[in-house]
Amino acid sequence: MRKRISAIINKLNISIMMMIVVLMIGCGQQAVEAGKDGAAAATGGRSLSEVLMEVGKSAENAFYSFMALVPDTLGLRVTKDTKKNEVGGYFNSLGGKLGKASDELEEVAKKSEVEGAKDGPIAVAIRAAVDTAKTTLSTLKEHLESLKGIGDDDKVGEATSNQNGVAASTDELKGAFKALKGIVDTAGKEGVAKPKAGDTAVKIGNADNKDGAKVLAAAANAGRAVGDKAAAIVSAVSGEEMLASIVASQEGDADAALAADATAQTSALKFARGGGNAGQLAKEAAKAAAVAGGIALRSLVKGGKLAANNNDDDKVVQSAGVTAVNKLLVAVEGIIKKTVKNVLEKAKGEIDKARAPKATGQ
């Protein structure tokens, strides 16, 4: 009986000792955790590494957020039934998406500015990276949202039989020019290559498409069926070439109609303004990108109408206008995506650099 009692007591003693050891180990671990990467009390009860891990996750979210937003915003494709103001709404919506990406970046900075660490080197570095990125996104947003009123209730490139061409609103034409130029210039500052206009003339080989420029007559019709020629000019260049030709214009080109024969130096903005003498527009030396850019602007900007002839030429003319606008939209979308990608990658790099573990004494 005594042996059994003694054995039970020994087992209890061993159990008690094991519990004491476990408790001591647990207390030691808690002490180590509390001291890891600085006092937990200074970071709202979380260790600094936990805070930084959260910041890192937010940076990843910021990097992918814009691309995740793209599918339901980018990719607008104009048809013969699309109204000009719908394209304006698209630009405004895209600006709003940039605003959301900027808001998410702001959350990254706020999460790094925890109590006791707001003025610390890590939070300061992250705040600087975020503010730099937000400045660029804000600039793009302003340019895009300024295009909200680019159009009216007319259909893109709308044309009727024997329709006289009408120059677009001078103010809106200038506004579109400044916004597109602002987007391209901002992209260039972020390492995105500027689009190039190319040297293709309206006469390509034996195909003389110069009469296609007559759709840009103002206060006059095209004089003959030239929709197919206009379509050929638009198909000869890319959207990037059209955009390059537009932003290479001078704002003053929108002030007055073309009063002399078009040359290789005649800008897209001047072609969009057009002129009363269709023959002065239709010159072999004219650059295809400038004419196509002019067709896109005339088709899209408030008040603008393309000139057409009869026998269904109006349908071909509108088709050329729609194609030109679609090409231009794709070019603008491409530059926006590349710019945002570069901006967020740069911000993420700076944030990760700030988050990286530092050697003792650094």
Swiss-Prot record:
InterPro entries: Borrelia_lipo (IPR000680). It is found in: Cell outer membrane. Keywords: Cell outer membrane, Lipoprotein, Membrane, Palmitate, Plasmid, Signal. The keyword Signal applies. SUPFAM superfamilies: Variable surface antigen VlsE. It is a lipid-anchor. Transmembrane segments: none annotated. GO terms for cellular component: cell outer membrane. Its main location: membrane. A lipid is attached at residue 27 (N-palmitoyl cysteine). The keyword Lipoprotein applies. Residues 1-26 form the signal peptide. It holds the Pfam family Lipoprotein_2. Genes for both Vlp and Vsp families are on (usually) unnamed linear plasmids in B.hermsii HS1. Belongs to the variable large protein (Vlp) family. Alpha subfamily. This is Variable large protein 25. It comes from Borrelia hermsii.
